[in-house]
Amino acid sequence: LLAHLAKLCVRSIGQPDAGLWEIRNGWQEHSFTNLMSWAGLERLERIKQAGHLGSISLDLTHARIHAAEALLRGVQGGALRNGPTDSSDDAALSQLPILGYPNRQLCESTVLRITHELSLRRGSEDTGFFYRYVRSDDFGKPEGAFVICSFWIAQALARLGRTSEARTILDRVLVAANHVGLFSEHFIPATNT
C-alpha cells in the first residue's frame, strides 16, 4: 500500500489538477499538490530509513527532491504561491511549516504573506479570519472566511515561534463556534454568521 501511495505521489508532481479546493474550470499545476507529494514522500523516506518499509523499487530520495523542485517553481517574490503560472495566494500553503518543510525562510515569508494578503479585515482591523483565496472561482469571489484557514495559520505561526500572534488569532476565531463548540466551514465576521 505504501509503495502504491509513493507512486501516486510521484505521478502527481507537476501535473495539472483541480487542486485542494476542487476548482472545476481551473485545472493547473498547484503548489499545494506538490507540497502534499513532497510531504508524503518525505514521510515514506523516513519510514524506509527506520526499517519499516520493505523493498520498494522507487528511489524515495530522488522522488522527494523532484517534488521539492516542483514546489519551488511556485515561489514568486520570495513566497510560495498557488502555482508556477498562478501568482495568487492560497491559505492552504500556510501548512508549509506545519508539514516540516526545511526552508524556514520560505515557510515564514509564505505564512506572513498569506496572513497579510488573505486576512479578512473589518476596516483596518484584522478579525483573525482568512479567505482561503481571493481569486474568482466557479462561484465568483469568496465573500466569507474559510474557518479552517485560521487554525492552519495559527498553527503555522506557532511552529515559526510567533506564539503571541497565533494565540490572538485563536482567541478571535472562537466567536465562530456555535452553542456546542462546533465551527462551520464559512464565517462572516461582520454578521457573526
Model segments located where?
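Well-ordered alpha-helical scaffold segments within catalytic/enzyme domains
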Residues: 1, 36-53, 95-105, 151-165
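The feature captures the catalytic groove of carbohydrate-active enzymes
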Residues: 1-66
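Extended glycan-interaction surfaces of carbohydrate-active proteins
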Residues: 3-21, 61-147, 168-193
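Short alpha-helical patches at coil-to-helix transitions and adjacent helical residues
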Residues: 30-38, 90-93, 147-150
